[in-house]
Curated annotation (Swiss-Prot):
It is a multi-pass membrane protein. It comes from Bacillus subtilis (strain 168). The keyword Transmembrane helix applies. One of its GO terms (cellular component) is plasma membrane. This is Stage II sporulation protein M. NCBIfam families: spo_II_M. Required for complete septum migration and engulfment of the forespore compartment during sporulation. Required for stabilizing and recruiting of SpoIIP to the septal membrane. The keyword Cell membrane applies.
């Protein structure tokens, strides 16, 4: 019998949960749109205050006064691991599924607000700035959040079905939890690489760009 590769397992997983992946992706992009809408709903004074602090930050960045890469990496991996770990735990809790929806939506809002504000205030320069400050880490981080969110929801639904059929969670196969834990490890590895990008790549790109803008 041919051994099933990890690629085949992943493709089968996506096929089996395609509707969930679509739902989670739509929820995330709704958050992105909502984040951009929040930018447009801000008053002029609010935008000016926020842009002032942002300009101060970019000014320090262009002067090479940003925090050390090691500190940024530590803060980034801690934040991402905490957020993803909470999603994972909520998937086991069954009743935490609505909170997973909210967390995915909020992640979209953060991305949408960040990009929307930079573009709104700085035009084309803001677009390129968001490109170098947001894109590198989020190339891996956004898929990690979407996969973790989908797996957490799918696992929670599986436990709910088990609860209604068996009237107990004690009969749930231990393999479920093993696979679910493996998913978390893979996602945390993606988050680790993403944090490396955020700490060591994005600041370099931002420093080069801000030195031309500020």
């Amino acid at each position: 019998m041919r051994k099933i590769s990890y690629k085949d397992m992943f493709l089968r997983h996506v096929k089996d949960h395609l509707s969930l992946y679509i739902f989670v992706s739509v929820l995330f992009f709704m958050g992105v749109i909502f984040g951009a809408i929040i930018v447009n709903s801000m008053t002029i004074s609010q935008k000016e205050d926020l842009y002032y602090y942002l300009s101060q930050f970019f000014g320090q960045l262009s002067d090479g006064k940003q925090a050390s890469s090691a500190d940024m990496f530590g803060q980034s991996i801690f934040h991402n691991a905490k957020y993803l770990g909470l999603m994972w735990i909520l998937g086991i809790s069954v009743i935490g599924m609505p909170i997973i929806f909210i967390m995915i939506f909020l992640k979209g809002i953060v991305v949408g607000f960040t990009v929307g504000f930079l573009v709104n205030q700085m035009g084309v320069s803001g677009f390129f700035l968001s490109f170098v400050s947001v894109l590198p880490q989020n190339v891996l981080l956004i898929p990690a959040y979407l996969i973790m969110g989908t797996c957490a929801i799918a696992f929670s639904l599986k436990l709910i079905r088990q609860l209604f059929v068996k009237r107990s969670l004690h009969d749930a196969p231990i393999q479920w939890f093993g696979r679910y834990a493996f998913v978390l490890l893979v996602i945390l590895f993606l988050a680790l690489i993403s944090s490396l990008f955020e700490a060591y790549l994005s600041p370099v790109l931002m420093e080069k760009l801000t030195s031309r803008l500020f």
